[in-house]
Amino acid sequence: MTDKTRIDELVTGLRQGPLEVRRKATAELGASGEAAVAPLIAAMLEGDNDIRWYAARALVQIGEPAIGPLLDAMRAAGDHDFRRYAMAALAGMGDAAVKPLVALIENADPVLQPFAATALMRIGEPAVEPLLRLMESPDPKTQERAALLLWKMGETGAGPLTEALITGSRSANNK
């Protein structure tokens, strides 16, 4: 665990340091855990895309504790570039981010849905089953969003989507 003073020093290095300092700061911030989440998100909100890239990499290392705060910041921030880098961080977290990202698709969050869709496509295989479950929703729009996302995943999602549609068609015909 890294204390607040050290985290602040590392974030300053991330913002102002030469390449090697930024790389080391990214690694140490990523290893700092939850205490570094808010300062990293603040750096992403205030910084340029280089800083966002390094901060996103550190957030990927931190993983699950960063998911909720990242989603909250994405909702609050109107900056498209910030949202894009935050989405990349969520995609880099893989399995841990699937459930909250699928919830954004299910709830048709107008602000974050496109970012969630992109992240889920990047995550790939771990997102397939949760999206297949969304296709069982009573809401046709939710079914449509899930099917479209599976299709856009390419081979990873299209095969399971096709099988689900065939199985669903058979079940409907047997009623």
Describe every region a protein language model picked out.
Residues 1-4, 19-34, 42, 50-64, ...:
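Structural detector for internal amphipathic alpha-helices that build alpha-solenoid repeat scaffolds
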Residues 76-78, 136, 170:
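Solenoid-like repeat scaffolds
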Residues 9-12:
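N-terminal intrinsically disordered, low-complexity tails
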